[in-house]
């Protein structure tokens, strides 16, 4: 999947767009599919936007792979460490 956004959209729209992309990922999982959002596609933005026929006012946000994960592939066994919530959030009671 290739995601683009109109260049005139302001910062708040980028937040909305991120939530939209996340919901695509959640919907995919609900249907048994795996996803991998990929911002690395941005380095090829000129080639990609031209290839998909995006108008000049659209800019590339990200790409996303979607399908069935190969659970036997060693790369799919990678589990990264997560910071505890207390490192980035403070709860006020």
What are these regions (language model features)?
Residues 1-51:
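Small-aliphatic-rich amphipathic alpha-helix that forms the alpha element of a beta-alpha
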Residues 49-56, 76-78:
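Short proline/glycine-enriched turn/loop segments at secondary-structure junctions
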Residues 34, 55, 69:
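Gly/Ser/Thr-rich beta-alpha loop segments that engage phosphate groups in nucleotides
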Residues 59-93:
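C-terminal helix-cap and adjacent tail motif
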């Amino acid at each position: 999947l290739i995601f683009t956004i109109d260049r005139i959209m302001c910062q708040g729209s980028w937040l909305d767009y991120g939530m939209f992309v996340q919901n695509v990922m959640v919907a995919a999982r609900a249907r048994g599919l795996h996803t991998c959002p990929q911002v690395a596609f941005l380095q090829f933005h000129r080639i990609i936007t031209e290839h998909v026929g995006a108008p000049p006012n659209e800019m590339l946000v990200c790409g996303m792979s979607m399908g069935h994960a190969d659970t036997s592939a060693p790369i799919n066994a990678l589990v990264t460490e997560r910071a505890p919530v207390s490192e980035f959030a403070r709860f006020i009671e």
